[in-house]
């Protein structure tokens, strides 16, 4: 979940682009991501075949490449999409604040997609995942409410250095989310085939 945040901080700095994520954005993202992950994954029911799985070896490291690879691939893919989206917006004449707003909104919603993509149970469709774990829908509603509140209230919007996206910005957010969902679904399908 943190890979896109790291990339969106480092890459603009290294390439001398306008800043995409300010400290206040990172604080808000941490306040959203950590509780969301804890609540959703802790409330997730155990997999149906959990007791049929062989136990993990005592010598197996939780930091083995096999365990980290999926998260790295997912996060780097989302980060690349957001960086390309930012570059496209800049080329289309969007202001740095407008580009930042689109990237921030898409990042927050992409984190929700990452949570959905990594659920252990009923991963074939969002509706099934929501029915198996009602906390996912609640987290989505709460996160969307926070985003709307930030964009609707000028003091919060100014604090976050964001702006309400125009038509081009909304289209960009929608396209980035669709591409992120395609990427995450593809990674999940490839991993399922490899593990089969």
Task: Please name every model-derived segment.
Residues 112-116, 179-189:
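Alpha-helical transmembrane segments
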Residues 81-85, 142-158:
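Hydrophobic alpha-helical transmembrane segments in multi-pass integral membrane proteins
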Residues 119-123, 185-196:
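Membrane-interface capping segments at transmembrane-helix boundaries
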Residues 76, 112, 145, 154, ...:
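Hydrophobic, well-ordered secondary-structure elements that form the walls
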Residues 89-95, 124-126, 155-163:
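Membrane-interface helix termini and inter-helical loops of multi-pass transporters
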Residues 1-122:
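Membrane-embedded transport module
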Residues 25-27, 51-71, 124-141, 160-168, ...:
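Membrane-interface segments at loop-to-transmembrane junctions
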Residues 104-107, 164-181:
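Small-residue-rich transmembrane alpha-helices that serve as helix-helix interface/gating elements
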